[in-house]
Amino acid sequence: MIKKGSQVRILRPESYWHNEIGTVATVDQSGIRYPVIVRFDKVNYSGINTNNFAVNELVEIQTNSYKAK
């Protein structure tokens, strides 16, 4: 289960971060097409370090035991 704080690998081939590892920032439950926002250490050509992905475009590498306050 992908949740906030999880380490994920990107499977989307056209993405700048294809096969890179990022950290899940948020997971939207409202039913949108790309509900998972992933944050990366390196920036793309535009200076952006986050992107939205569908759940099926991600593979969870490590689960973080993040607990909201």
Swiss-Prot record:
Cell compartment(s), UniProt: Plastid, Chloroplast thylakoid membrane
rRNA-binding listed as a keyword: no
Tagged with keyword Chloroplast: yes
Keywords tagged on the record: Chloroplast, Membrane, Photosynthesis, Photosystem I, Plastid, Thylakoid
Record's bilayer topology term: Peripheral membrane protein
Main location: plastid
Domain of life according to the entry: Eukaryota
A GO cellular component annotation in the UniProt record: chloroplast thylakoid membrane
A UniProt-annotated Pfam family: PSI_PsaE
Leader peptide range in chain numbering: none
SUPFAM superfamilies recorded: Electron transport accessory proteins
Similarity comment: Belongs to the PsaE family.
HAMAP family attached to this UniProt entry: PSI_PsaE (MF_00613)
PANTHER family assigned: PHOTOSYSTEM I REACTION CENTER SUBUNIT IV A, CHLOROPLASTIC-RELATED, PHOTOSYSTEM I SUBUNIT IV
Function: Stabilizes the interaction between PsaC and the PSI core, assists the docking of the ferredoxin to PSI and interacts with ferredoxin-NADP oxidoreductase.
Name listed for the protein in its UniProt record: Photosystem I reaction center subunit IV
Species whose genome carries this gene: Cyanidium caldarium (Red alga)
